[in-house]
């Protein structure tokens, strides 16, 4: 399983027989997509930092299936599937289950080729500074995030996650790491890859240093369109 970082919350997971693409908003270098195999495009929600209509153009050159959160306005064309939180959909060799978000749309749990993959979308502990976000209630944000993690733990906790993509948003200041650290503490993924950090790659090393000894690997990377690791 090869993991490629695209940008922001965009990743490619390349398996032996299929490729999974999550929240791609930038042009994908052509050498990262392969013909002669199935390419599944996942979009967690309609925010412009997670969804770009550009991904629909790949259907003309590649064998593609699209799995969109149902808050995205319906697009014409076949092989586009819309899904709400807490639903399941399957295709040959791949099982997909959705969970909720603390913002908009869904988070994805994908099982394929013996691998368990979780993409959080905007499922995050949004602990904003109330001075800059006076309408935010930190206690409510904490409660909602922890409740969703508990639901995930109850429903799929028996499946060890091979990789989880979780927001580490530096705009939250010192609270940027709360979601990832809580996720590791409760769900124990083998690998956790930070996302949603815009261009602030420094948060990756900081999280890795903070989670030394946790048993979860946090790979380091410092650029777009790079291979993060092989697992």
Residue ranges and their predicted role:
Residues 33-35, 53-56, 79, 131-132, ...:
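Short amphipathic alpha-helical segments
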Residues 1-36, 79-160, 223-231:
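Core dinuclear metal-dependent hydrolase active-site scaffold
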Residues 18, 61-65, 187-191:
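A short helix->loop->beta-strand "cap" motif at the edges of active sites that frequently abuts
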Residues 135-144, 163-185:
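Active-site-proximal segments of metal-dependent phosphoesterases and phosphodiesterases across multiple
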Residues 26-72, 153-165:
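Active-site metal-binding motif and surrounding structural segment of the metallo-beta-lactamase
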Residues 1-8, 77-89, 102, 150, ...:
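Binuclear metal-ion centers of metallo-dependent hydrolases, dominated by the metallo-beta-lactamase
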Residues 20-22, 42, 67, 117-120, ...:
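Structural motif
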Residues 27-30, 46-51, 72-76, 89, ...:
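Active-site environment of divalent metal-dependent phosphoester hydrolases
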């Amino acid at each position: 399983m090869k993991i490629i970082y695209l940008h922001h919350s965009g990743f490619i997971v390349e398996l032996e027989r299929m490729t999974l693409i999550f929240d791609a908003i930038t042009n994908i270098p052509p050498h990262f997509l392969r013909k002669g195999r199935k390419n599944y495009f996942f979009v967690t929600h309609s925010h412009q930092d997670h969804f770009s209509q550009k991904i629909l153009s790949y259907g003309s050159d590649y064998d593609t299936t699209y799995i969109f959160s149902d808050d995205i306005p319906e697009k014409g064309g076949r092989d586009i599937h819309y899904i709400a939180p807490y639903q399941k959909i399957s295709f040959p060799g791949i099982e997909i289950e959705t969970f909720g978000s603390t913002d908009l749309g869904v988070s994805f749990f994908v099982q394929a080729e013996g691998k368990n993959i979780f993409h959080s979308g905007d499922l995050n502990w949004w602990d904003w500074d109330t001075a800059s976000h006076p309408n935010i209630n930190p206690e409510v944000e904490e409660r909602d995030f922890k409740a969703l993690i508990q639901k995930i733990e109850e429903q799929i906790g028996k499946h060890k996650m091979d990789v989880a993509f979780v927001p580490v948003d530096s705009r939250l200041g010192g609270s940027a790491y709360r979601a990832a650290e809580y996720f590791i503490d409760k769900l124990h993924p083998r690998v956790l890859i930070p996302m949603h950090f815009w261009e602030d790659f420094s948060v990756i090393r900081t999280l890795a240093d903070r989670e030394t000894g946790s048993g979860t690997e946090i790979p380091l990377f410092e650029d777009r369109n790079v291979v993060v690791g092989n697992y």
